[in-house]
Amino acid sequence: MVEVRYLGHSAVLLTDGKTRIVIDPFLTGNPMAALGVGEVQADLILVTHAHGDHFGDSVALSKKGGVVVSTFEIATYAEKHGAKSVPMNLGGTYRFEGGWLKWVPAWHSSSFPDGTYGGMPMGVVVELGGKRIYHAGDTALFSDMRLIGEMGLDLALLPIGDHFTMGPEDALKALELLRPKKVVPIHYNTFPPIRQDGEAFAQRAREKGVEGHALKPGEVLRLD
């Protein structure tokens, strides 16, 4: 069994009871954050791209014992600021106790708030506790999502905010390519430009045969 806790915006915490993985830990300064940095402990800290609302508290969490896993550029930046890191890139697979993760493409941009280049933006597929979870990061719809879907996804975490990423209509089209068993919308309602109705998206996903869950920050979805 794997627990998926939505922390707000694009931040999620995954655990199988042994390994704890946080993705895009934007907590400090996040008006929707369910937990603060002091309440989150992670073994692996996955960062899909360098924008501040995704890199977030990666360094602070690493200093508590976690390892930042991301692009070469982001990992190097994190190390310079005192984090432990594993530099990777698109297509690479990292194995850990109880599972693995693989970086896949995303269509977006990636730079730190100070303008430092963050490498290519990415999505990630995580296998943990026998479940496969796709976190799309920030992305537009793209046809190669079909290849990601061939990995056999138990859950897809998809941005629906529009403006900076795909919106609900494109995210629904993404479901046709990805064919996950379940979907959770992310990256919406944090700021005015990305206001969306998560429950309406989840309902439309269910109409397409995908189990949709619009989690509130702090809520947990269990994958049995």
Swiss-Prot record:
GO molecular function ontology, one term from the record: hydrolase activity
Keyword Transit peptide: no
UniProt keyword terms in alphabetical order: Hydrolase
Keyword Transmembrane: no
A family per Pfam: Lactamase_B_2
Family that this chain belongs to: Belongs to the UPF0173 family.
UniProt-recorded name of the protein: UPF0173 metal-dependent hydrolase TTHA1283
Organism placement in taxonomy: Bacteria, Thermotogati, Deinococcota, Deinococci, Thermales
